[in-house]
C-alpha cells in the first residue's frame, strides 16, 4: 500500500529523479525562473526552499549542507550572497508557480516557477 508516501515519482527511478531535481534546482537558482511541466514545478519547491532557508544564515556548516545537495560552488555562493539576504524577512514560500498553457507536442500542462521577489528586467526603473 502507498499510504503516507510523499512526493511524486514522475515516471523515473530514484537516482534519475534526484539528479533531475538537483539540476532543476540549480537552473532555478541561476536563472531565477524556469519553464517546466506542472508536476515537476510542484515538486521543485520541496528541494529549493530548504536550501534558501539554510542560505539565510551564512556559516560554514550551512554552506556544506547546501553544497551536499547542489554540488556547485558558484551556485552555492550565489545562494548565500544574493538569495539568502533577499529572503531574510520571509519565513517561507520563496517560490511561485504560474501555469502557462499546454505543450504543443504532447499537450502536457506547462508552468513557470520563479522566486517571489525576483528582480525582472521590466520592473527595474531607469534612474537619471
Swiss-Prot record:
Protein name as catalogued: Large ribosomal subunit protein bL17
Top-level taxon of the source organism: Bacteria
GO CC, any one term: cytosolic large ribosomal subunit
PROSITE patterns referenced in this protein's UniProt entry, alphabetically: RIBOSOMAL_L17 (PS01167)
Molecular function as annotated in GO: structural constituent of ribosome
Gene that this sequence comes from: rplQ
InterPro entries per UniProt: Ribosomal_bL17, Ribosomal_bL17_CS, Ribosomal_bL17_sf
Lineage of the species this protein comes from: Bacteria, Pseudomonadati, Pseudomonadota, Gammaproteobacteria, Candidatus Palibaumannia
Pfam families given in the database record: Ribosomal_L17
Source species: Baumannia cicadellinicola subsp. Homalodisca coagulata
Family: Belongs to the bacterial ribosomal protein bL17 family.
Subunit structure: Part of the 50S ribosomal subunit. Contacts protein L32.
Keywords: Ribonucleoprotein, Ribosomal protein
Keyword DNA-binding: no
GO biological process: translation
Amino acid at each position: 500500500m502507498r499510504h503516507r508516501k510523499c512526493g511524486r515519482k514522475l515516471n523515473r527511478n530514484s537516482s534519475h529523479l534526484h539528479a533531475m531535481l538537483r539540476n532543476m534546482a540549480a537552473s532555478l537558482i541561476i536563472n531565477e525562473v524556469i519553464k517546466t511541466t506542472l508536476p515537476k514545478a510542484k515538486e521543485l519547491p520541496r528541494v529549493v526552499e530548504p536550501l534558501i532557508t539554510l542560505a539565510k544564515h551564512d556559516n560554514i556548516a550551512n554552506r556544506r549542507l547546501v553544497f551536499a545537495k547542489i554540488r556547485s560552488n558558484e551556485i552555492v555562493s550565489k545562494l548565500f550572497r544574493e538569495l539568502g539576504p533577499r529572503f531574510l524577512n520571509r519565513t517561507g514560500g520563496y517560490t511561485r508557480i504560474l501555469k502557462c498553457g499546454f505543450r504543443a507536442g504532447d499537450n502536457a500542462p506547462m508552468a513557470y516557477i520563479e522566486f517571489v521577489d525576483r528582480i525582472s528586467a521590466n520592473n527595474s526603473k531607469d534612474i537619471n
